Amino acid sequence: CYMLLYLGVFSRENMQIEGFWYYLFLGTFEAATIHYAVAKIFGPLLFGRGWCGYACWTAMVLDFLPYKQPQKPRKEKLGILRYVMFLLSLALVSALFLMQVTHLEKIMFWMFLAGNAFYYLSGITLALIFKDNRAFCKYLCPVTAFLKPMSYFSLLRVHCDERKCVHCGKCLQVCPMNVEVNK
């Protein structure tokens, strides 16, 4: 809540991915830049994608929805949408800089509000369509473009002990993110 309400609303600092690009292009290290560097770029080297499960405010809201376990397997082809979102956010902020738009701080604040509204509405819509609370995380979240490559080198990650695994599939049935631990 601190990052979402205090930094985002009261301090008017965009904590979404667009805010990260904005402050990075400015060459300033505001809270958004530091947050992305620690939690989403270098943090996954230690904790994997722990951010998603324990600290993401979008996932927190989506976890109140009734679909704790996905009803169907993940639709792998839709995962490309997260990279489209990632590139769109980069392109949008880049365009604002290249066009030398005035009042960029005010625009970034409204982008923060609109971005969060879009994330929550699309997350709820996807959850209802796919009957999966974390459908937004799996298919649309642009932050995973940072998290995914770094988490491959993570020190802390879920592993399957092949000597004890009976390949019953129960772990996959109860995992909200469809993580296939035995692969």
Regions found by a protein language model. Give the residues of each.
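Non-ligating segments of multi-cofactor redox enzymes
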Residues: C1-N182
